[in-house]
């Protein structure tokens, strides 16, 4: 029986971004594979974070940004003429940022914020279960179950990042975007987040920007290499790191530039 290729959860076609007339992304085509960790690598300023922000329209918040081309979620154009409500889109495509950014609220209220905003469950027992389940999925429940009323900002850096992941998954997104989620963390906290990412891909499609070649090789199944606003090469992570087809990719992963 022939194995069917993995279907894309999201796609980009001729996706371009200009900031005040300056090109940051130049007509990118890319499929985001469902049920995988899709890593985006490349030197600083190559467009990978700009691309990531296109996937849930975070670039809409930047006045000078102009986006053209197409990006789809399950075949629906998120920039189409009818438009997709950015708030609803961001519930389906969550985001975890480079530095942990818990709200100045309790641990409980950080996780409950999204479900309350979208009216997903009732307060009380239903919300309690959702908060607990989200914290368990983020590998944080046992560490905070007795201090849920404490401020999220009172946690360690690694715990704060896991709290932000719990907050993202509390609204049951289909895709989680991660913009260098470990860059501000120590090696122990980084290892825990990487383990968590591997667990989460059983439920969510993940797109992750990382500057760490080792991290991309460890946690992703598909890797796209960006350079100067374009995609140079995309493929299975093992192939990208062991037998890249493009000499520019080879130069980057071996440290000759970047």
UniProtKB/Swiss-Prot annotation:
Part of the ABC transporter complex PstSACB involved in phosphate import. Responsible for energy coupling to the transport system. The complex is composed of two ATP-binding proteins (PstB), two transmembrane proteins (PstC and PstA) and a solute-binding protein (PstS). Pfam families: ABC_tran. It catalyses: phosphate(out) + ATP + H2O = ADP + 2 phosphate(in) + H(+). It is an enzyme of class 7 (translocase). GO terms for biological process: phosphate ion transmembrane transport. SUPFAM superfamilies: P-loop containing nucleoside triphosphate hydrolases. InterPro entries: AAA+_ATPase, ABC_transporter-like_ATP-bd, ABC_transporter-like_CS, P-loop_NTPase, PstB-like. It is found in: Cell inner membrane. ATP binds at residues 42-49. Residues 10-253 form the ABC transporter domain. GO terms for molecular function: ATP binding; ATP hydrolysis activity; ATPase-coupled phosphate ion transmembrane transporter activity. Belongs to the ABC transporter superfamily. Phosphate importer (TC 3.A.1.7) family. GO terms for cellular component: plasma membrane. This is Phosphate import ATP-binding protein PstB 3. Keywords: ATP-binding, Cell inner membrane, Cell membrane, Membrane, Nucleotide-binding, Phosphate transport, Translocase, Transport. It is a peripheral membrane protein. It comes from the Bacteria. Its EC number is 7.3.2.1.
């Amino acid at each position: 029986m022939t194995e069917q290729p993995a279907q894309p959860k999201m796609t980009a076609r001729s996706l371009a971004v200009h900031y005040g007339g300056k090109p940051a992304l130049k007509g990118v085509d890319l499929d985001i594979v469902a049920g995988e960790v899709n890593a985006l690598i490349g030197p600083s300023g190559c467009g990978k974070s700009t691309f990531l922000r296109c996937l849930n329209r975070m670039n809409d918040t930047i006045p000078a940004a102009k986006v053209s081309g197409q990006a789809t979620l399950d075949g629906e154009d998120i920039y189409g003429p009818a438009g997709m409500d950015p708030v609803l889109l961001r519930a389906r495509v969550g985001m975890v940022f480079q530095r942990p950014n818990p709200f100045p609220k309790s641990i409980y209220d950080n996780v409950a914020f999204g479900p309350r905003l979208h009216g997903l469950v009732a307060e009380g027992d239903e919300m309690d279960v959702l908060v607990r389940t989200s914290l368990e999925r983020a590998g944080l429940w046992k560490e905070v179950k007795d201090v849920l009323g404490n401020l999220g900002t009172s946690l360690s850096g690694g715990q704060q990042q896991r709290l932000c992941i719990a907050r993202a998954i509390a609204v049951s997104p289909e895709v989680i975007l991660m913009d260098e989620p470990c860059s501000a963390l120590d090696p122990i906290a980084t290892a825990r987040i990487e383990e968590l990412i591997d667990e989460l891909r059983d439920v969510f499609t993940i797109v992750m920007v990382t500057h760490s070649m080792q991290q991309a090789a460890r946690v992703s199944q598909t890797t796209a290499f960006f350079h100067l606003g374009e995609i140079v090469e995309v493929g299975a992570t093992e192939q990208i790191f062991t037998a890249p087809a493009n000499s520019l990719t080879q130069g980057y992963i071996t440290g000759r530039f970047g």
